[in-house]
Amino acid sequence: DVLVHCGDICGEFRYALGESRDYHLRAVGGNCDYEGNLPKELVFLLGDYHRVYLSHGDLLNVRRDNRNLVRMAKQNGCDIAMYGHTHVPEVTEEEGVTVINPGSPVRPRGGSHPSYAVMEIEDGTGKLAILQKELP
């Protein structure tokens, strides 16, 4: 299992991520993460079939559109691009790249509800299922 955090970890939640866990953590720093040394972007494998480009998105102008995010994903050979910054949940397909913003469980914006995303990869086929989850 992999926990992916798209930035703006902020405060003590960052330390909770490091406590005993049964998952791999992949995280980038956001524009509100002033302490620490998280990378601004990260590329990693998800299972045997998917390559992920992860960025908070603030440096790629994702408030305007996903063009730079998709370009960076493609330059890095990725079929999935994940970002945060806007705190608005989104799952789209752009130029062969699955673009995912899980939203925010704490500070949703744009009229969205607190949310996160769950990705499941089917064994043997690599088929990806993405579920947007709203918190109660």
In which residue ranges do the predicted regions lie?
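Core catalytic region of metal-dependent phosphoesterases/phosphodiesterases
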Residues: 1-46
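Active-site neighborhood of phospho(di)ester-bond hydrolases with catalytic His/Asp-centered motifs
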Residues: 2-8, 26-31, 53-56, 79-85, ...
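Active-site-proximal segments of metal-dependent phosphoesterases and phosphodiesterases across multiple
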Residues: 34-76, 107-110
